[in-house]
Structures are given as C-alpha cells and as structure tokens.
Regions:
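Secretory targeting and sorting signals
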Residues: 2-33
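N-terminal hydrophobic targeting/anchoring segments and the immediately downstream early-domain regions
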Residues: 32-387, 394-401, 418-429, 435, ...
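Short acidic catalytic loops
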Residues: 73-74, 405-415
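Histidine-centered active-site/metal-ligand motif
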Residues: 75-77, 285, 321-322, 414, ...
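Conserved acidic
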Residues: 391, 395, 408-411
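Short catalytic-loop micro-motif centered on adjacent basic/acidic residues
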Residues: 409-412, 437, 458
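Extracellular glycan-binding segments that recognize GlcNAc-based cell-wall polysaccharides
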Residues: 585-706
Length: 706
C-alpha cells in the first residue's frame, strides 16, 4: 500500500472524527439518543429506595375523541397514618430520612406484634407478626393487615406508570377511636388531623417535585379545578383531588340527638376546607352525627364502632323498618357486609378457627363501655328492621346546600339509606351533578338516581372476577347516561382487600403491558421482597393495583378494563358539571330557640337556634310567584307577603314562592301559637298540632319539612 495514500486516508478519518465530536457537543442530539433522564424519570431519587419496575413512557394527550385516558381511584387514604392519634396506621407515605424510616412499624408492634391491638379487632387472630419493614417485609404490608402502610409514594408512582390518572386522597380520622386506642403521639381533634393530612399531601407533592428538578416538575399534582386536572392528565401526570372522610366534620357531633354545631360552624368549616383545596367530602362516617345517620358496619368491626358511637353520642345505633327496598347493612355479630360469596365462605372458616380470638376482641369492646352499659342485641330484629332511623337532619340539609354553593362533590356511601334518599332529593331539587359513591357502600337501588343526576360511581376493589361481574351489572345504565366507572381501593382505610388469587389457572404472567400498551410492568421489588399479584394479592399495596387490573383482563374482563381506562374522563365530567351549577333557589330554614320562639329565614340562624326544617324558595321572580318578607316580632320572626311587614320590624326579603302548586312543591302555611305569641311556618295543614293556621303563604320547593 502507498504510505502517502494511507496517511491521507487516516488524516480524513481523523478530521471526520473531530467534526463528529464537535457536532455531538455543539449540535442537537441525534434522534432517539437520550441526553439525560426522560421527563417521567426522577433526576434525584433517594438511595436506597423501592423500585418501580415499569419501563416505557407514560401516555399523554387525549384519545381521538378528545377524551383524557386513565383509570381513577376515587377513594384512598394516603395520609391515614397522620390520623387516629398517629399510631394506628404504621409507616409513612414518604420520609426525608428515606425508605427505612418511612416503612417501619409502630414501636409497640416490636418485637412480635403482640400489642397490635387494632389488627386483632379488625382482622382477628392474635396480631403477632414480624414488625420489620424495610428491607425484608416478611409480614407486611399485607392485604389483610389494617394497620400497615400500603401507599408508599413509589408504589403510588408504579400505579401512575401503570395507567392511573386520577387519585382522590380522602383525609380520614376518628376522634373516638383515637381516644380509645392505647397508643398515640398527638391529640384527637378531628379537624386538626384533617388539616395536617392536607398539609402532608402538599408536602408529598413537593417531595416528588424535588426528585424531578423543582416545583411543578413531578408527576404528583394536587388539583383544585377540573380544567387543571384535565391539563395535568394530558401532560401524562397524576391529578390528585383532596377529599375528607371523618366522623364529626366541623365539630358536628350529636349528643343524645342534640346537635353540637350550628349553621355558622358549617359555613366556616366548608369555607376553610374549600380554601385548603378540598373538593369532595362525606358528611357522616361510622357514627351518627349532627348532620346525618350512617350506614351500619357489620361483624366485630360493627360491634366496635357501635360501642364508639355510644361513647361519642350517648346513643347506640337505632333501627326501624325500611320504607322501601333499600336497606342498611345488618349490625349483628355476623360477617362483614360487602364480601363476595367465596369471601364469606372463607371468612366463615377463618371465624371458626379464630373463635377464641374473636371472643377476646368482643370482650375488649365490651370492656370499653361504662359499667352497667350493654351493647344492644339486634339479631332477632334484623329481618324486620334493618334501617337506621336517623336520616339527614336540617343541619345536614344545610350542609348539602352549602356544598352545592361551593361546587363541592358530596359522597353518600356512608349515609344511611334514609339520609342518602333525602340528600339525593336535595340534589335533585337543585339539579346538581356533584354526587359520588366511591367504594361500594351505597345501596345499589340508588344507582340510576346518581347517574340521572350526572354523578360518578366506583366499585370497591374485590377479587378481579367479582369486580368485573359487579361492573357489568350496571354497564347498561352507564351507557344510557354516559357515565364513567372507576375503582375505590380504600387502601389504608381498614377495608377488606383482595388477597392471593383463588384460581391457580391462567395467572398473571410477568412482564405484562399496561392497558394502553405503552408501558411494561414486571414484578414489583421493594428491598429484598418481590411482590406478585398471583401469590400476594392485588390488595397488598398500591403498586399492585395495575397488576390487579391485569388480573381483570386475563380472567376475561377486557371490556371492564377498557371502561376503567375511560374513568378519568367520567370523573372529570361530573366535576365539571358542578362548576357550571348555579341554583335558582335559596334555602328557607325554620329554627327554634326556647323562650324566644321560631323564625324562618334565608339568612344564617342566630346563635342558640336549632334547625327544624328546610325548604327552597326562588331567589328571583318568576311567573306565578310572590315575594315573602321576614319580619321581627319580639324575639322571633314571621313571614308575610306584605313589604310593610304588617307594621312589624322588617328584616328583609327571603325569596319567592309559587302562588299555585308546581311539581316538587309543598304548601307553606303560617301558623300561630297564641299561648306564647309565637309564629312559625309549616308545610302541614294542621300546623303540627292544636295551633292556629293563619293562612297559606304559597308553595315552596320541598327539601324537608316537619
């Protein structure tokens, strides 16, 4: 070879290499060559930490019809470890000190779980377990342990990567359970705990943001408006909605059926929660309160909650014959309501095996009651009386109307059927879509009423075949009303959750693709523990929810998976409809205070007045209506169509009533009690007793009345 030619070629090769290097350094990156972490990958994840075990880019944008995609979990409790006194749920969603600090058991569970008292009550057995979390996780988290953290942030991240796009984080606590539980590191005020959990949710957002390079860059995005949520989902991130599920919101407890809160307390409480970002909430949970009666719990858990109800309110649950086909859960010491047939059979076998432990739990519950107080026995009357006699109170109706005024969504799952019926009637009168049933606690007879309003329903996280079967039961109704469907995992909420697959055949095979097809999920690994939905169960921790959805698919539920992936759109449409709501009505509230008398007003009731009834009156004039005025008489007030207030002191107009009956209206009479010179309004022609009926004022829209 000619050495000069070889040298010449070498020189050109060298020049080419130099130019290529310059291009790589100064020019744009070659197509497909990553210049660093992708947008969905953190730049600074703590080490060590849980793995996510998902590859592929999260889907973004919309489908061909302009709809967002992704499944919704409308009921989960990320921060329940901050409620109930701080030591009922062990472990945290995140910790600045790392995974070993976040995923560790409560101090009293060491060395062998013998003091895991709440586990004994809710799960039976003796509570013994290996308390060590990171890195071994021998015994927890588990689908059947109510007291160990299930929503570590990296597990939530895996759910997002697996297709979730809406997460409703319900702040939860219970002051009575907190006060009764032996171990706590803080006070038991419910609203203080709710505020802390909201704060921690925002701190989690900042924690994730820091991993991704700064504020706003992370995948965990708290949203307060539906259009904001839609934008977040289109970016491929997780929209997080704040909710509240507590037993005595705003301090609205009842003692011996006497309310301990006022309209002003409700308004202040709703204003505060809305300002903090809360957009959905329950008005009652577990205990009958000043707003509504509850849907009973069953089994040992129901027994414990009924005891707590007495300690909180001085009253046990009280039943009455149901007015229709809808009914509340049975109270007796039997199995928990909500299990599948197979689950009931398994639970029955376990109950027999753990009879001694269950008897011990019952003894502990009875021991919490004052001496001489016994739990009522409901078993003999369950067939004839299975409904809570307590419904939606006048204060509760005011709270429902207050939520519609603030465009918040009402959760009705824990309401008694009487309360749910009354709440739905209020919302129907208002033509308000913001009604939710998010974890399978609503009587299914209300389903069409919820869909007709434009509300949203999710199914509880049962075994995959059972969930699919339940989803299909009302698929035709969803198609009729254009409603979406979702999941309510209720993780960290002491709920029954699915364990290992009952059938060994046709297992979930790893790795598998996410429902959209764009990501690949392998077995999830945390520390030394490898999780598998086939042997551990989808209800073990939050990172296995995508695996459980894959289980739905492989067991013949592709149609259900397809519908779940439209759930985010369905939830947002319900939320969006609340934003466009403007009620033509104002509440007309009847109140009473001893030694003062009655008043009926569209303004907040003064201090000391209790609520007796609520109606709706029109805010603006309409054909066939007349205006009513409130007038002060001594310490009470009367209503009149006379702008001059019949010579009494004017307090202002209350609204317009119809002069003739219209659909949904009730008559409104002015009544008088001569012995105490007291006026009041009623929709009863007999004026509720031997009182004087002074005349018909008009016709108001029914909400509730005496």
């Amino acid at each position: 070879m000619d050495r000069r030619r070889a040298f010449g070629r070498s020189r050109y090769v060298l020049i080419g290499l130099v130019l290529a290097m310059v291009t790589l350094v100064l020019g744009p990156a070659a197509a497909g060559a990553p210049a660093g972490p992708q947008w969905w990958e953190p730049v600074a994840r703590p080490a060590p930490d849980s793995q996510v075990n998902v590859s592929g880019e999260p889907f973004t944008g919309t489908d061909a019809q302009g709809r967002v995609r992704g499944y919704v979990d409308a009921h989960v409790h990320l921060m329940s470890n901050e409620g109930f006194g701080g030591r009922l749920v062990c472990g945290k969603v995140f910790s600045a000190a790392g995974v070993a600090d976040a995923l560790k058991d409560c101090p009293e569970h060491y060395p062998d779980g013998v003091l895991a008292l709440f586990d004994m009550i809710t799960n039976g057995g003796d509570g013994r377990h290996d308390p060590n979390g990171w890195p071994t996780f021998r015994d927890w988290p588990a689908h059947d342990s109510a007291t160990h953290q299930q929503t570590y942030y990296a597990w939530v991240e895996r759910a997002w990567r697996g297709g979730q796009r809406v997460l409703v984080n319900d702040m939860v606590t219970n002051g009575v359970i907190c006060s009764l539980y032996f171990f706590k590191d803080r006070g038991c005020d419910e609203m203080t705990a709710i505020r802390l959990q909201i704060q921690k949710t925002y701190e989690l957002q900042a924690y994730v943001d820091a991993m991704y390079g700064g504020a706003g860059k992370g995948w965990f995005r708290v949203v307060t408006e539906p259009d904001q949520a839609r934008k977040v989902i289109q970016e491929g991130k997780l929209a997080v909605v704040l909710g509240v599920e507590t037993s005595e919101p705003f301090g609205c407890k009842q003692v011996l059926d006497n309310a301990r809160c006022t309209m002003a307390d409700i308004d202040r409480g709703l204003d505060e929660l809305h300002r903090l970002g809360v957009r959905s909430m329950f008005l009652c949970h577990k205990f009958d309160n000043a707003l509504c009666g509850v849907r009973f719990d069953s089994g040992t858990q129901g027994m414990a909650i009924n005891a707590g109800q007495f300690l909180s309110t001085g009253t046990f649950w009280s039943t009455e014959p149901c007015a229709g086909p809808e009914h509340d859960n049975p109270i007796g010491f039997g199995l928990a309501a909500g299990l599948t047939a197979e689950g009931r059979a398994d639970a029955g076998a376990e109950a027999g095996a753990d009879a001694g432990a269950e008897a011990d739990a019952h003894a502990r519950i009875r021991g919490a009651l004052p001496e001489g107080v016994e739990l009522p026995q409901y078993d003999a009357s369950l067939q004839a009386a299975q409904c809570n006699r307590r419904g939606l109170t006048a204060l509760g109706e005011y709270a429902v109307l207050g939520m519609t005024k603030r465009n918040m969504m009402l959760e009705i799952d824990h309401m008694s059927v009487k309360a749910a019926n009354q709440a739905l009637r209020v919302l129907e009168t208002q033509h308000y879509s913001g009604v939710l049933s998010t974890h399978g606690w609503m009587d299914e007879n209300w389903t069409e009423r919820v869909y007709r309003l434009g509300g949203f329903i999710t199914g509880h996280m049962y075994e995959a075949p059972a969930f699919a079967a339940e989803a299909r039961e009302h698929a035709a109704l969803r198609a009729k009303y254009g409603a979406g469907y979702g999941i309510g995992t209720d993780m960290n909420g002491f709920a029954w959750l699915p364990g290992p697959r009952a059938a060994a055949g046709n297992p979930v095979r790893y790795p598998f693709r996410s429902p959209d097809g764009g990501s690949v999920l392998d077995r999830q690994v945390t520390g030394q523990r490898v999780w598998d939905v086939n042997t551990d169960g989808g209800g073990t921790h939050y990172g296995l929810v995508p695996d459980w959805i894959e289980d739905i698919r492989v067991t013949g539920g592709q149609d259900v998976v397809d519908e779940l992936m439209q759930g985010a759109e369905g939830y947002l449409r319900t939320w969006e409809r609340t934003r466009g709501h403007s009620s033509p009505y104002a509440p007309l509230v009847r109140g009473y205070r001893p030694h003062a008398g009655h008043l009926a007003s569209s303004r907040p009731l003064p201090a000391g007045f209790t609520h007796e009834a609520v109606w709706n009156v029109l805010r603006d004039p309409a054909p066939g209506t007349i205006r009513l005025y409130e007038c002060k008489v001594a310490d009470h007030s009367l209503l009149t169509p006379d702008p001059g207030c019949e010579g009494q002191q004017p307090l202002g107009p209350v609204g317009y009533v119809y002069t003739k009956p219209v659909p949904g209206s009730v008559p409104l009479y002015r009544c008088y009690i001569p012995s105490v010179f007291d006026h009041f309004v009623s929709n009863r022609a007999d004026c509720e007793g031997p009182y004087v009926k002074e005349g018909l004022l008009g016709h108001a829209m029914a909400v509730s009345g005496p």
